[in-house]
Amino acid sequence: MQMKNFKEDFPLLRENPVVYLDSAATAQRPESVINSEMEFYKKCNANPLRGLYDLGFKATECYEQSRETVRKFINARSEREIIFTRNATESLNLVAYSYGMNFLKKGDEILVTVMEHHSNQLPWRVVAEKTGAAVKYIECNPDGTITEEQLKQAFSERTRLVAVTHISNVLGCKTPIKRITELAKECGAVVVLDASQSVPHIPVDIQSLDVDFLAFSGHKLMAPFGIGVLYGRESLLEKMPPFLTGGEMIDSVTRDKVIYSDLPHKFEAGTVNAAGAWGLKTAIEYIQNIGFDTIGGIEEELTKRAFDGLMKIPHINIQGSNNPKEHCGIISFTIDGVHPHDVSSILDADGIAVRAGHHCAQPLMEFLGVPSTTRASIYFYNTKDDIDAFLNSVSSVRRRMGYGK
């Protein structure tokens, strides 16, 4: 397919020769997002939800318009179900502490997959320690697939909460979330979905997925740092106590009684990141203008190009599926005899940015039998030249490490 060069929309990529292949960690920001955040500070800079003057009203309007944009983007039923946070980590911790600590008890079981990012594992382990609930793992296969048998082995009449990733940040594979949700409903469990790696790449429809909570970070879909989203089913959010307390999340306070604000502000204590929310709105609009069909088509072609090229290089071991279409732009690999950190350093010397390490998924690394991997993650602003430069550099790693070839 003929690809548009989207790098022109991104100041860092336009003005810097870097080959950026670490979008699963954070995406680059288009000029429109950078400008929108600056415009907020130039024209609307006041404390939202507080100032009873024109500038304060404008700031509040921007903030709430951003919430409505997010609601439409993920097809939530009400803006009351959209909570702004700092990132997916905070969103998941909010659910763990506000829901898990209050509604789970000794003997209950929490299911997570072995592929989870630590942000969707550790909060549940803390909940288990505090409540007496138990964390159980849904096993997967080396290619990241989860079978019906593996699901049924994990679920039981004690399952009360299931926390799963939508797309693995290591293997790029999709979990069978609709089937997981069906099984969860059969035993009365709620489902918490980490959509950090899916929201930037594929359409995410809350009502179709029918999950109870969903979390993602803005920065992975080109929004500013410091803005994240938690979707929560309204009937559950209504029952949950606040996660943080302080300014602007109360209706009234006396010496003897506190009445908390209505949704969604009950969960947004303190001064909010209105500029970040406005930048998130712009990032969503930018994605919508391009379209997920275009984004997916570019990513699929470039992933196949990278995958096929790596398969031709000796001593390369790709983690996950043998089908590049099942990687969602994420390719984790190892090179025989070379530590991933050394691979990353060599590629960095060639102007190529990739991630090396355990990717905050150490139980998955243990399952795969590797301490760490090198990860290349592709987004629609990458080009064929980027992939070719990456492959050329990877092919030289063993020689440059003194192996000859």
Q: For each predicted feature, which ranges?
A:
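Pyridoxal 5′-phosphate
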Residues: 1-405
